[in-house]
Amino acid sequence: MSAYVSTRRVGAFASSRVAPQDDFSVLSQQLGQGFFVLSRKNAIEKILTKEEKIMAEEKKIPYKIYLEEDEMPKAWYNVRADMKNKPAPLLNPGTHQPMTAEELEGVFCADLVAQELDNENPYIEIPQEIRDFYKMYRPSPLVRAYCLEEKLQTPAKIYYKFEGNNTSGSHKLNSAIAQAYYAKKQGLKGVTTETGAGQWGTALSMACSYFGLDCKVFMVKCSYEQKPFRREVMRVYGASVTPSPSMETEIGKKINAEHPGTTGSLGCAISEAVEVAVKNPGYRYVLGSVLNQVLLHQSVIGLETKAALDKYNIKPDIIIGCAGGGSNLGGLISPFMGEKLRGEADYRIIAVEPASCPSFTRGKFAYDFCDTGMVCPLAKMYTLGSDFIPSANHAGGLRYHGMSPVLSQLYDDGLMEAVSVEQTKVFEAAEQFARVEGILPAPESSHAIRAAIDEALKCKETGEEKTIVFGLTGTGYFDMVAYEKFHEGQMDDYIPTDEELAQYAAKLPQVNE
């Protein structure tokens, strides 16, 4: 402590600075005889101003904020209950009428259909069996990116919710275990699904292994070839893995015939998985993103994030998530969006998507098929067209032509923003993050990192001390081919032209709303 005791330090007890002398005598004189100074530390604590106490508390924020097990969410949050403008209903692809529960149950598990159609209940209880499973890897940490802040020399405070501490290496296990639980409860033999980068397929494989279910995975062909070890992890858990489009389904044969040499897409893989599910008794289709039920399960991310922030009285200014189909983004923002919808708080929410697959930023808000084969229900969403096949970029989990109907409605209502970024810029951010934070991020997650860094640098220019929270959805240890391409200068930034997108948009189904 300085020999000078400023007016700011002793508050109302001092009217001016005093001459240099012993700290204890100064404090004793100015605080009066009724105050017994035990030590230098006690004296300083007693005279801290409110501002300084806040600063002191901020210094106590740990690098990682963990919740206790008993603080984990006991119910999922259903943001649709608080939406004034509800997402448009799924439509039967043949009749263009709203899908009934009975129709949906031919494809999905019955309990999941009930969750899909529930627009009223704000909270849905998490079954105890699922909560017990969550304890294997949850709660996940909310990390203060002190090292990244220092590297950027920004006044912004950066936090990230890290979802990579489980066998799938991502957030996907949050919904996989829930969907496998309901399939087992229904007495099914097994499930089918699609996977892009492989995290969802890995998560579902593990969940099915846990509950003793058969698991058939159709993996987007470019990822199947780029990430051979990811498919081997799925096989460790007993799943069968097929590159999509394949020659095992009628849809796959048709797509291969129409697009020779295609690298596939999530839309293709969905079509194949649905075909196999409906043709085989005792099977149902489950999915890793897009639909309401998945965003519901992923709300554990946002609920934990908010609880961790509340522990330290932290209110974020900006919340950022990568966006492919919307599962991670929807889960991360859900409780914050709920507050925004109810008028209790305001946040700036940013979706980040690849420039090669810009559903939000360049797509149309319209009804479209959820799959390339046009066998799934029609959903009203931001879409590039169901037959749009993105370039073979290295963010396989974001290569989807559409977007969650929930997020699409929120975006259309002006409640969130969206930006698209080129993959070379994404990998620059990924490498910068890895070198200071010690985690090799997945390419998908790195889209959010790119936007978070950009926002932090804006704060550096303006001097604003904004609090930024982003979702680090998973790790990139199976994405080394992508990192190799980046380091060797072999990574391209393909961006579809307006003419290309117009051609796909012209093929959107005509629906009378």
What residue ranges belong to the model's regions?
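Claisen-condensing/thiolase-fold acyl-transfer catalytic domains that form or cleave C-C bonds
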Residues: 323-331, 423-488
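Alpha-helix C-terminal capping segments
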Residues: 178-188, 202-214, 235-236, 333-343, ...
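Active-site-proximal loop->helix
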Residues: 192, 200-263, 359-371, 480-488
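Positively charged, low-complexity intrinsically disordered leader regions
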Residues: 60-188
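N-terminal amphipathic/hydrophobic targeting modules at extreme N-termini
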Residues: 3-12, 16-17, 26-33, 37-42, ...
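A short, small-residue-rich loop immediately preceding and capping a beta-strand
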Residues: 175, 183-222, 315-329, 349, ...
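Active-site/ligand-binding loops adjacent to catalytic centers
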Residues: 123-125, 255-293, 301, 313, ...
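Active-site nucleophile and cofactor-binding loops and adjacent substrate-binding regions
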Residues: 162-173, 191-200, 320-325, 353, ...
